[in-house]
Amino acid sequence: MKQIVIASRESKLALWQTNYVKDRIQQELNIRCQINTMKTQGDIILDKPLNKIGGKALFMKELEIAMLNNKADIAVHSLKDVPYQLPQGFCLSSFMPREDPRDAFVSNKYSSIDDLPRGAIVGTSSLRRKAQLLHYRYDLEIRDLRGNVQTRLSKLDNGDYDAIILASAGLIRLELNERITQFIPVEISLPAVGQGIVVIEALDKSSEILQKLQKLNCSDSFCVATAERAFNQELKGGCHVAIGAYAELHDNQITLTAMVASSDGKNILKRKLTGDDPMRLGKLLAQEMIELGAYKILEK
């Protein structure tokens, strides 16, 4: 194999992720790479929340079409943007080492969530973040915030918001660590499924590519991601519901913490389970939470 063409979105963060994968393929597999950038519907439609326009798949469809049309061999994604069910014919071939999975509190005026005054305006379009923030601080005003990292930071700097919530991983990768005012504890805001993990998507019939890319796979990331995604799949969660899940691996034991919440944050259910089989663990925890009324909470 002489070359691999990688499909990527055009944002700085997407290109950082793609170049990271490109460098690893070239250095570790000794295969030349070319990047094919493109805009997705998720990048173009910025005036509506994701849950109103079709969900996370809007960040992937154009990249998948490029693979089907032989204009790319693989695509690179942030795992938190990947739906629990891929279109037929596609698979996730490699999981990269996880960056800090926590949410980041970013503000020019306040040092932490606790420091925000009553009625402060916080920007996020994530139902998961909104629900958990309102559960912790019901007196805050949450307003939608879409766009790439730089666009969101500009809106904060222009005074549109008192604070915004972003993924720490994205800020760290873009060397914008100094913008992080507070790493939000997972006890306050449980991360999105797969947050902090970069993945490679490929056609499942591309056996030669899949075999080579397997060498890049981080087994720890694959393990925790499998648990989190199994939980999400059992609940059939997407960006239209407030669901969070975070798995930690210690001595071959996985501890999975998960939560579901009503969109207003008034009702929240959080549980934790430990086991050694990630797929089974995710399903068991989801089933336990369903029995405790998870679906009723998500419908509110």
Curated annotation (Swiss-Prot):
Molecular function GO terms recorded: hydroxymethylbilane synthase activity
Pathway: Porphyrin-containing compound metabolism; protoporphyrin-IX biosynthesis; coproporphyrinogen-III from 5-aminolevulinate: step 2/4
Enzyme class: transferase
InterPro entries, per the entry: HemC, Porphobilin_deaminase_cofac_BS, Porphobilin_deaminase_N, Porphobilinogen_deaminase_C, Porphobilinogen_deaminase_C_sf
Keyword Transferase set for record: yes
GO biological process: protoporphyrinogen IX biosynthetic process
Cofactors (names): dipyrromethane
Cofactor binding remark: Binds 1 dipyrromethane group covalently.
Gene3D superfamilies in the cross-refs: Periplasmic binding protein-like II, Porphobilinogen deaminase, C-terminal domain
GO CC term, one of those recorded: cytoplasm
Superkingdom of origin: Bacteria
Keyword field: Porphyrin biosynthesis, Transferase
Residue(s) carrying S-(dipyrrolylmethanemethyl)cysteine: C239
Reaction catalysed by this enzyme: 4 porphobilinogen + H2O = hydroxymethylbilane + 4 NH4(+)
Keyword Transferase carried by entry: yes
SUPFAM superfamilies: Periplasmic binding protein-like II (SSF53850), Porphobilinogen deaminase (hydroxymethylbilane synthase), C-terminal domain (SSF54782)
EC number per UniProt: 2.5.1.61
CDD domains documented for this protein: PBP2_EcHMBS_like
Signal peptide span: none
Family: Belongs to the HMBS family.
Other facts: The porphobilinogen subunits are added to the dipyrromethane group.
Role of this protein: Tetrapolymerization of the monopyrrole PBG into the hydroxymethylbilane pre-uroporphyrinogen in several discrete steps.
Assembly: Monomer.
Protein name: Porphobilinogen deaminase
Lineage: Bacteria, Pseudomonadati, Pseudomonadota, Gammaproteobacteria, Thiotrichales
